[in-house]
């Protein structure tokens, strides 16, 4: 897994500094319901504000690392940093996934994530989008 974090932010605690110091982080997948909080946490500095409190989010103890997860997130991906690559204004963190925690209500009888029920969102080019519509199955392009 790799994530990028902007290094050149003034007057704020930079995520990249926190990740460098701790060597770990959690990727919390987010939902339509959490979209406002997701945006707020992405643009608001944590230097003088408690984003958990401001957005009524609950910190949750991770299973394998010390970094907290967000309880309201349906999927938490716990990661340990393996390498850091400086890319201009960003750092790229190459990380090992050490645990994945999923809200059991979103798993089917075989343990697969029911994506259509998760109501996950994605961010692309300044916009938030919902996910979840099944538009094909692996191999459908070559089946007759």
Residue ranges with predicted function:
Residues 1-13:
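Single conserved hydrophobic/aromatic residue that forms the stacking wall/gate
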Residues 10, 14-144:
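Active-site-proximal mixed secondary-structure blocks
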């Amino acid at each position: 897994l790799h994530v990028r974090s902007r290094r050149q932010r003034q007057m704020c605690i930079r995520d990249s500094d926190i990740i460098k110091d701790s060597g770990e982080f959690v990727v919390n997948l987010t939902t339509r319901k959490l979209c406002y909080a997701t945006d707020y946490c992405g643009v608001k500095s944590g230097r003088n504000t408690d984003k958990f409190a401001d957005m009524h989010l609950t910190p949750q103890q991770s299973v394998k690392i010390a970094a907290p997860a967000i309880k309201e997130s349906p999927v938490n991906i716990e990661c340990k940093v393996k390498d850091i690559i400086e890319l201009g204004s960003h750092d790229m963190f190459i990380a090992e996934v050490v645990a994945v925690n999923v809200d059991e209500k979103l798993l089917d009888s075989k343990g697969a994530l029911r994506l259509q029920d998760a109501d996950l969102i994605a961010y692309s080019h300044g916009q938030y989008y919902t996910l979840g519509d099944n538009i094909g199955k692996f191999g459908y392009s070559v089946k007759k």
